[in-house]
A protein has these predicted regions:
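Cytosolic, long alpha-helical scaffolding segments
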Residues: 1-218
Length: 218
């Protein structure tokens, strides 16, 4: 019976992860293609759905623990899903941040060509997808490869920040737009960080090895 409930729980998590991934993809798509309707859909339709799923999963986990009092591996799995649930909801919030800044930017002239942000987003989306796959398949090799990708996203963020500081210094009229681009790049970076957190948890639950978090989660 518990095994059936755990499988049901994992299906709910996969649904939530799919929504989180879709929210990030749509927020970037709306920015690149300047499509207001896509961005508004992320904010007005997808976010409420994400919040519903987060609450549903949280209650499901709490009820499982109360009813079945799981031990050892099963308890660790439920606790990890609780944490992943929180991380995925935060990724949804970050996609909303991206969409809100994108809604501001698409109505104004571009500060710079959008080259690095789509690259950065592609890396982060792949990290998220692989993080969830590593959990489903208990694939620590895949989880470790995701952790290594985090540096790529960080480097792109630093490059974007340096460029935007140069733009703002030379032309103060770009400051407000540049700040929104910085907000987008930092949101993408946090998505990559949260995906890495998921992978660290996969490694712990599968191998029993604690991988120290490389960054604060502020």
């Amino acid at each position: 019976m518990l095994e059936e409930k755990l499988n049901e729980l994992k299906k709910k998590l996969i649904e939530e992860a799919g929504l989180a991934e879709d929210m990030v993809k749509k927020s970037i798509e709306g920015l690149i293609e300047k499509r207001k309707e896509i961005l508004e859909k992320v904010v007005k339709k997808y976010e409420p759905k994400m919040n519903e799923l987060e609450i549903e999963l949280d209650e499901f986990c709490t009820n499982l623990i109360a009813l079945y009092q799981p031990e050892a591996g099963n308890l660790r799995t439920i606790l990890m899903i609780l944490k992943m649930n929180n991380d995925l909801e935060r990724i949804g919030d970050l996609a909303v941040n991206i969409s809100e800044s994108a809604l501001f930017l698409i109505e104004r002239p571009p500060v710079k060509p959008l080259i690095d942000i789509p690259r950065m987003a592609e890396e982060a989306i792949n990290m998220l997808k692989n993080a969830v796959d590593s959990f489903i398949n208990k694939d620590t090799k895949l989880a470790k490869s995701v952790c290594q990708k985090d540096a790529v996203v960080d480097n792109l963020r630093d490059q974007i920040l340096r460029e935007l500081i140069t733009y703002m210094s030379s032309d103060p009229s770009t400051i407000e737009r540049s700040i929104h681009l910085i907000r987008i790049s930092r949101s993408i970076e946090r998505i990559a960080d949260l995906s890495t957190n998921i992978c660290e948890d996969v490694i712990f639950i599968t191998e029993g090895k604690v991988i120290k978090h490389h960054k604060d989660e502020s």
